């Protein structure tokens, strides 16, 4: 009778914990949460299984999970990831331990898609390797769009999944499940990187062995930091002339300010690149087979790299000592850490965002990709090790920690939308609970209930149907109408998750279909592209009667115009690209404006007093009311704010948005019958225009952080091109056979630069542009823009 009695006591203890969790002091709660691990240990013992059975085990695990969920609500900061992992159901713990959600990100042409193609081949996901640009009429698996294969660039992030078999330290093979997203490298498609990193647990940052850290590498680093994504680094293209992996390591340390150290050294370089030396185990690794399918290990390290291997191993330990306490103690005691201690330290420091281990290889030459995959398993976190927070709308958006238990209420984030032959495809990351086919889920943004008709795992443009997806996984769902960034729950929780960062567009152009019969397809395409891409905006200019599209650059908009032609068979006419200028106030100006129209019928009366001034930085506009004594009622002040916001949408100078302007209303007057919300809104707009004109306002133009790379023999020509565009050159780096120029350029002066650069460098130069900041436009340009706008307004009034 002892076992049943023990079982009853354990069950009562667990349920007692659940009922009383919200009333317990946090220290005691954590102790009790931890205590459920012992109950689960008993649950898998044979004697316990025979008495309770499978149902009781699930009930106990569910109770433990509920207690942790309650702790996640009450005090998310006090609930550690360790406590969450300790209370996982054993089956779930094993599943999550073998799962990695990773992305591959880098500067354009660093070899991301080529590397992903090898990963898919070595994991058995594809049967043959195909190259970027579709040279063999097939193209890389992850570049599924024809445009991607033709241009040799990734335009959309692509998701896939695969299994990687890795031997543990006892030599036993362990299978790991990878959810993998390949991202674009071009700055125009940066939103694809943003939304991928928003939902991933780790990343592989790829660098070119020749160029090292480049402009988009810095952008990717900033995005990884924004979402707290740990990364390992892979120095690719070791077979290229001028390859110098240690320059890349130094640049990660110095340019990215991220502690980094090589965990491998190359055996040879350029056309003599043979393999790598594993600095942790001090073994030489070579790829063998027609496509490098097998890794051959040798205990003997080639003499030519022995010295540098010893030196770099010492540097690895020294760098780890700076970021990990355990290694620091060993280092100070002048002891040598073991292999396991080094691996554990790298893992702790990498997951803690303090360090990145650097691997080396050549994806195109099929060398050293598999050791990088081992690094993904060894050093990047599983879903249970990553802290994810949501906002509880029922408790004034208080932060709550999400717990990756399948038995808990479902919470997921829609991070990407895509049109397919079967309708809208919504990519979802499941953070908590289970998403099941046929289940009802609720959109936290609009509280709409939708049914999940079909769940698939994506493999680029192919898909495999599944019945359910557990916590920590990524999937795609058909038949759900939503927007990118929407949170879905099972309806019992009022949770919503913060969305990804969406940069503002910098380039616009007018567009219309060449034939009026294509209007329906044109509208359908515009609606779809906006839904899929938050950086692609569509607006209608009533004054010019034109549809305006806005995006991150010329290439961004060109791609959508071409997609419209290919996917919807709509040929379009486009205007010249237009720069997204801004306007800003000059000096502080006080105003006292009276709007008075009283002519027998219902009149208008509103008096507003106050001042306008710069905010001190070119940032968001601010409206404040400092009215004392109730001279203007709350509803009229709300109308004043509305009038201010409308005025900022279209400035008086050239009709562009206003930045960095603050309006304060501190007094005014109303009329008993003639004052209305409309009159105060109009009065505020009139006061805004008058005060803005008196403040010596300015037109602002966007400056672009521009990086140009070309062979050294064209350096003079490239500098000349930039000088013609009044660029401010900030830095120049000269390498063995190429140079890089960093400059700030006016976006207005960069239209057509791509063609000029190709002509000046015989097609060998490349450049990237990224929005930097707004700055006052030159006086002559301001006069031209204002005169052009005034003339256009006058011409419209004549009509």
UniProtKB/Swiss-Prot annotation:
It is found in: Mitochondrion. Mitochondrial GTPase that catalyzes the GTP-dependent ribosomal translocation step during translation elongation. During this step, the ribosome changes from the pre-translocational (PRE) to the post-translocational (POST) state as the newly formed A-site-bound peptidyl-tRNA and P-site-bound deacylated tRNA move to the P and E sites, respectively. Catalyzes the coordinated movement of the two tRNA molecules, the mRNA and conformational changes in the ribosome. The keyword Protein biosynthesis applies. SMART domains: EFG_C, EFG_IV. Keywords: Elongation factor, GTP-binding, Mitochondrion, Nucleotide-binding, Protein biosynthesis, Transit peptide. This is Elongation factor G, mitochondrial. The lineage of its organism: Eukaryota, Fungi, Dikarya, Ascomycota, Pezizomycotina. Pfam families: EFG_C, EFG_III, EFG_IV, GTP_EFTU, GTP_EFTU_D2. One of its GO terms (cellular component) is mitochondrion. Its main location: mitochondrion. InterPro entries: EFG_II (IPR041095), EFG_III (IPR009022), EFG_III/V (IPR035647), EFG_IV (IPR047872), EFG_V-like (IPR000640), EFTu-like_2 (IPR004161), G_TR_CS (IPR031157), P-loop_NTPase (IPR027417). Pathway: Protein biosynthesis; polypeptide chain elongation. One of its GO terms (biological process) is mitochondrial translational elongation. Belongs to the TRAFAC class translation factor GTPase superfamily. Classic translation factor GTPase family. EF-G/EF-2 subfamily. One of its GO terms (molecular function) is GTP binding. Gene3D superfamilies: 3.30.230.10, 3.30.70.240, Elongation Factor G (Translational Gtpase), domain 3, P-loop containing nucleotide triphosphate hydrolases, Translation factors. It comes from the Eukaryota. GTP binds at residues 106-113, 182-186, 236-239.
């Amino acid at each position: 009778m002892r076992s049943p009695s023990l079982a009853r006591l354990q069950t009562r203890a667990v349920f007692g914990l659940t009922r009383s969790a919200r009333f317990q002091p946090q220290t005691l709660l954590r102790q009790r949460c931890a205590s459920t691990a012992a109950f689960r240990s008993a649950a898998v013992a044979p004697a316990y299984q025979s008495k309770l059975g499978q149902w009781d085990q699930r009930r106990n695990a569910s109770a433990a999970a509920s207690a942790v969920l309650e702790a996640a609500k009450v005090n998310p900061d006090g609930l550690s990831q360790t406590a969450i992992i300790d209370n996982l159901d054993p089956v779930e713990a094993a599943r999550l331990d073998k799962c990695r959600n990773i992305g591959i990100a880098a500067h354009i042409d660093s070899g991301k898609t080529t590397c992903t193609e090898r990963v898919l081949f070595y994991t058995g996901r594809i049967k043959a390797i195909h190259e970027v640009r579709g040279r063999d009429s097939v193209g890389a698996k992850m570049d599924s769009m024809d445009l991607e294969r033709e241009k040799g660039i990734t335009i959309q992030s692509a998701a896939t999944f695969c299994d990687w078999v890795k031997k543990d330290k006892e030599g036993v093979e362990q299978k790991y499940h990878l959810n993998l997203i390949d991202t674009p490298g071009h700055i125009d498609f940066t939103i694809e990187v943003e939304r991928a990193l928003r939902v991933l647990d780790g990343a592989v940052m790829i660098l070119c062995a020749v160029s090292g850290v480049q402009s988009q590498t810095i952008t990717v680093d900033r995005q990884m930091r924004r979402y707290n994504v740990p990364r390992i680094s892979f120095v690719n293209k070791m077979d290229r002339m001028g390859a110098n992996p240690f320059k890349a390591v130094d640049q990660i340390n110095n340019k990215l300010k991220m502690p980094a150290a090589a965990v491998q050294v190359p055996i040879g370089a350029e056309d003599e690149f043979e393999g790598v030396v594993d600095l942790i185990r001090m073994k030489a690794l070579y790829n063998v087979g027609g496509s490098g399918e097998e890794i051959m290990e040798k205990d003997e390290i080639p003499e030519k790299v022995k010295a540098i291997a010893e030196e770099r191993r010492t540097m690895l330990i020294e760098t780890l000592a700076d970021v990990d306490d355990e290694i620091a103690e060993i280092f100070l005691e002048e002891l040598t850490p073991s292999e396991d201690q080094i691996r554990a330290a790298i893992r702790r420091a990498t997951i803690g965002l303090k360090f990145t281990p650097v691997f080396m290889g050549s994806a195109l030459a099929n060398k050293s990709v598999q050791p990088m995959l081992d690094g993904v398993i060894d050093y990047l976190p599983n879903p249970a090790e990553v802290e994810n927070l949501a906002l509880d709308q029922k408790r004034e958006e208080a932060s709550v920690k999400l717990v990756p238990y399948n038995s808990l209420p479902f919470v997921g984030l829609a991070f990407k939308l895509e049109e397919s032959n079967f309708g809208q495809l919504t990519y979802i990351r499941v953070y908590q609970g289970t998403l099941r086919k046929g289940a009802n889920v609720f959109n936290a943004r609009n509280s709409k209930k939708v049914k999940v008709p079909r769940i698939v795992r994506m493999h680029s443009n192919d898909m495999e149907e599944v019945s359910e997806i557990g916590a920590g996984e990524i999937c795609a769902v058909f038949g759900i109408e939503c927007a990118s960034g929407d949170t879905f729950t099972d309806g019992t929780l009022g949770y919503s998750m913060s969305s990804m960062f969406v940069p503002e567009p910098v380039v616009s152009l007018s567009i219309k279909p060449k034939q009026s019969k294509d209007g329906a397809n044109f509208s359908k395409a515009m609606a779809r592209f906006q839904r899929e891409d938050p950086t692609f905006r569509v607006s209608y200019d009533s004054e010019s009667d034109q549809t305006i599209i806005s995006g991150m650059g010329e290439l961004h908009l060109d791609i959508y115009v071409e997609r419209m032609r290919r996917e919807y068979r709509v040929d379009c006419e486009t205007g010249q690209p237009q720069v997204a200028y801004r306007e800003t106030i000059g000096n502080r100006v006080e105003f006292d404006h009276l709007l008075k129209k009283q002519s027998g019928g219902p009149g208008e009366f509103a008096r507003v007093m106050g001042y306008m001034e710069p905010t001190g930085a070119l940032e968001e506009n601010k409206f404040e009311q400092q009215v004392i004594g109730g001279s203007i009622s709350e509803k009229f002040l709300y109308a004043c704010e509305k009038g201010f916001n409308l005025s900022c949408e279209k400035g008086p100078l050239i009709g562009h948005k206003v930045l960095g302007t603050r309006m304060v209303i501190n007094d005014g007057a109303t009329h008993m019958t003639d004052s209305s919300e409309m009159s105060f809104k109009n009065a505020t707009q009139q006061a805004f225009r008058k005060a803005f004109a008196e403040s010596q306002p300015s037109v602002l133009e966007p400056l672009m952080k521009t990086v140009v790379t070309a062979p050294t023999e064209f350096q003079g020509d490239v500098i000349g091109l930039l000088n013609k565009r009044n660029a401010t050159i900030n830095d120049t780096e000269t390498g063995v056979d190429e140079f890089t120029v960093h400059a700030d350029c006016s976006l207005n002066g960069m239209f057509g630069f791509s063609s000029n650069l190709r002509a000046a460098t015989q097609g060998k130069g490349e450049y990237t542009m990224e929005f930097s900041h707004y700055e006052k436009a030159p006086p002559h340009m301001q006069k031209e823009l204002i005169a052009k706008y005034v003339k256009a307004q006058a011409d419209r009034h004549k009509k």
